């Protein structure tokens, strides 16, 4: 279905699992990170400079909650933002300035309370205590969700 939508040039956006599914469907590779959980507030650095990314800036802080991630991007994808933990955090497809699809590993749709609840439910179970406590401590950082959504949707020409 993703390949069909992509071939029809229908704008497509993927968040977290959607980011991973789009990448795999279009020829990338997703794996569980050898570094474990990426959870809490993470900083992502700009790697390429499409016009729409100037609104976001050279870096942004976003909410992470994942083990799996895109380890090999599809040939038709550009990695716009990444970190040492997650090198392919934002991918755009086909065209740097006017992409058909954009996907993001972090969670611009989350509010602090949502991620805090997820971490607290998983800490000591699926998320190791040390990682979970560090993630909870990171939630005091200011995140940039507001400045992420509009440029992503604008790049897809849906707003």
Predicted regions and their residues:
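Amide-donor transfer/coupling interface in amidating biosynthetic enzymes
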Residues: 46-159
């Amino acid at each position: 279905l993703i390949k069909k939508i992509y071939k029809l040039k229908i704008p497509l956006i993927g968040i977290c699992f959607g980011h991973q599914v789009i990448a795999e469907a279009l020829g990338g590779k997703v794996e569980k990170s050898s570094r474990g959980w990426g959870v809490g507030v993470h900083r992502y650095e700009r790697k390429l400079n499409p016009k729409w990314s100037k609104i976001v800036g050279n870096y942004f802080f976003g909410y992470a909650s994942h083990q799996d991630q895109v380890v090999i991007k599809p040939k038709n994808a550009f990695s716009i933002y990444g970190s040492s933990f997650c090198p392919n955090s934002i991918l755009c497809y086909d065209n740097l300035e006017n992409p058909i699809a954009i996907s993001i590993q972090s969670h611009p749709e989350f509010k602090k309370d949502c991620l805090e609840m997820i971490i607290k439910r998983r800490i000591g179970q699926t998320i190791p205590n040390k990682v979970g406590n560090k993630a909870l401590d990171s939630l005091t950082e200011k995140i940039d969700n507001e400045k992420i959504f509009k440029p992503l949707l604008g790049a897809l020409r849906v707003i």
